[in-house]
């Protein structure tokens, strides 16, 4: 990357309603011990009745704008990463822009499942590189609780709802809440897509009067996804570090996609990072898909885990399959 983009300001939002493992015990045949042992998740935030993905996105966007000391009038593009849009049309970015009172902006959705934030970051960087005066409001938001099969204990225990946001810009004089995007890699392998799906598109359309089948909800081959996720995130991180001449010693903190604790620990171990260098908040939020990394970034900053001068390695893996990694310098 010859002219690095800046991430200016970070914001996050999680719905007020919390669903604990004890709550889920009354819904499906499972226990708190079973969930915690296998996933590390103790609770997850879920939307209230009538609350949508765009509602979560708006709250995170407002927080990011405030952190960046920017106003909606400063934004030229709105990019929303989600696999749980409010509707097929209009796109969620247009809805977010409307709710924020914004007109005259380019508004676009990006769907790369759990990799959505890093894919969105790649797109935003391209926009800023082509049009240096641009300021891209990048929001990743999911309401996966609305697409979970609450009778399937293998998936419903994993997911939560939330949103995270940042502003991508080339403002070299910006200092407040700023990180430099040093480099990133995103990639995919569509041949493995059937291992993790959310149905309901034109390949499986519904007619009026049809009952909703299991294929409408999240379906996942957990063991296969685990294997590919760990291998892919490890490899892409090694590739990114190598092409920048870095080793693990040059990284101060790793923020992996918060899929589950076993995946997070396996990736950290294979990369050779001490556990204290790997940020984890999956126990409080569950897997929030595209929102996972920006939510974790905001959380890590709030906890004082990220300080000026630190280099942070992000890595993710999602349906598609899609995966990637990015290096930020704060």
Curated annotation (Swiss-Prot):
InterPro entries: ACP_syn_III_C, ACP_syn_III_N, FabH, Thiolase-like. The active site is at residues 114, 257, 287. The keyword Cytoplasm applies. Its EC number is 2.3.1.180. It comes from Nitratidesulfovibrio vulgaris (strain ATCC 29579 / DSM 644 / CCUG 34227 / NCIMB 8303 / VKM B-1760 / Hildenborough). CDD domains: KAS_III (cd00830). Homodimer. PANTHER family: 3-OXOACYL-[ACYL-CARRIER-PROTEIN] SYNTHASE 3, BETA-KETOACYL-[ACYL-CARRIER-PROTEIN] SYNTHASE III. Keywords: Acyltransferase, Cytoplasm, Fatty acid biosynthesis, Fatty acid metabolism, Lipid biosynthesis, Lipid metabolism, Multifunctional enzyme, Transferase. The last Arg residue of the ACP-binding site is essential for the weak association between ACP/AcpP and FabH. It catalyses: malonyl-[ACP] + acetyl-CoA + H(+) = 3-oxobutanoyl-[ACP] + CO2 + CoA. It is an enzyme of class 2 (transferase). Pathway: Lipid metabolism; fatty acid biosynthesis. Belongs to the thiolase-like superfamily. FabH family. It is found in: Cytoplasm. GO terms for biological process: fatty acid biosynthetic process; secondary metabolite biosynthetic process. Residues 258-262 are annotated as: ACP-binding. Catalyzes the condensation reaction of fatty acid synthesis by the addition to an acyl acceptor of two carbons from malonyl-ACP. Catalyzes the first condensation reaction which initiates fatty acid synthesis and may therefore play a role in governing the total rate of fatty acid production. Possesses both acetoacetyl-ACP synthase and acetyl transacylase activities. Its substrate specificity determines the biosynthesis of branched-chain and/or straight-chain of fatty acids. Disulfide bonds: none annotated. GO terms for cellular component: cytoplasm. One of its GO terms (molecular function) is beta-ketoacyl-acyl-carrier-protein synthase III activity. This is Beta-ketoacyl-[acyl-carrier-protein] synthase III. It comes from the Bacteria.
């Amino acid at each position: 990357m010859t002219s690095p983009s800046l991430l200016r300001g970070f914001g996050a939002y999680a719905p007020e309603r919390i669903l604990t493992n004890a709550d889920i015990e009354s819904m499906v045949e499972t226990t708190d011990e079973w969930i915690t042992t296998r996933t590390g998740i103790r609770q997850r935030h879920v939307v209230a009745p009538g609350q949508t993905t765009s509602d979560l996105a708006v709250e995170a966007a407002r927080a990011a704008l405030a952190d960046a000391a920017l106003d909606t009038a400063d934004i030229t593009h709105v990019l929303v990463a989600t696999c749980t849009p409010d509707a097929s049309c209009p796109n969620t970015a247009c809805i977010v822009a409307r709710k924020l009172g914004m007109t005259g902006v380019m508004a676009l959705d990006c769907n790369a499942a759990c990799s959505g934030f890093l894919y969105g970051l790649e797109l935003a960087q391209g926009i800023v590189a082509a049009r240096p005066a641009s300021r891209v409001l990048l929001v990743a938001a999911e309401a996966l609780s609305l697409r979970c099969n609450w009778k399937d204990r293998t998936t419903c225990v994993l997911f939560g709802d939330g949103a995270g946001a940042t502003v991508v810009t080339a403002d070299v004089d910006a200092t407040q809440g700023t990180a430099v995007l040093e480099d990133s890699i995103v990639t995919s392998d569509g041949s493995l897509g059937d291992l993790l799906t959310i149905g309901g598109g034109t390949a499986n359309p519904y007619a009026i009067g049809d009952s909703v089948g299991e294929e409408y909800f999240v379906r996942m081959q957990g063991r296969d996804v685990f294997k590919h996720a760990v291998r892919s995130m490890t490899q892409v991180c090694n590739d990114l570090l190598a092409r920048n001449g870095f080793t693990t010693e040059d990284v101060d903190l790793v923020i992996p996609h918060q899929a589950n604790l076993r995946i997070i620990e396996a990736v950290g171990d294979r990369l050779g990072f001490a556990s204290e260098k790997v940020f984890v908040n999956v126990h409080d939020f569950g897997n929030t898909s595209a929102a996972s990394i920006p939510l974790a970034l905001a959380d890590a900053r709030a906890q004082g885990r990220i300080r000026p001068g630190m280099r942070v390695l992000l890595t993710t893996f999602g349906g598609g399959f899609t995966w990637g990694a990015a290096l930020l310098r704060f």
